[in-house]
């Protein structure tokens, strides 16, 4: 019983922690730790389960789509941040060497000797 209660409390705590939180390295590390801990707790749960345990597990599974939506939001924020960093780096390099990406469209070769 205590494993299911711990799983429920950890899941509820994690949902509260990531809900609307801005992306940060600490949050990503907390999510990784939570997922490892949660995986261990799920592996330790053994049947038969009482009615209260079944209800708590149902509540945990009901929180799952909410957690997934928040994780998707955080993933999109990280993608956007990486894209902006890549664009800034490209702009910075274009100011340093503006002729690096020149094409040779307008050149021709003179065949006369």
UniProtKB/Swiss-Prot annotation:
Q: What is this protein called?
A: Flagellar protein FliT
| Keyword Chaperone included in the entry's annotation | yes
**Subcellular location, in the record's words?**
Cytoplasm, Cytosol
Known role: May act as an export chaperone for the filament capping protein FliD.
Q: Which family does it belong to?
A: Belongs to the bacillales FliT family.
Q: What is its main location?
A: cytoplasm
Coiled-coil stretches: 25-91
Task: Offer a single GO CC term for the protein.
Answer: cytosol
GO biological process terms on file: bacterial-type flagellum organization
Subunit structure, as described in the record: Homodimer.
Q: Which UniProt keywords apply?
A: Bacterial flagellum biogenesis, Chaperone, Coiled coil, Cytoplasm
Per its UniProt entry, which superkingdom is the organism in?
Bacteria
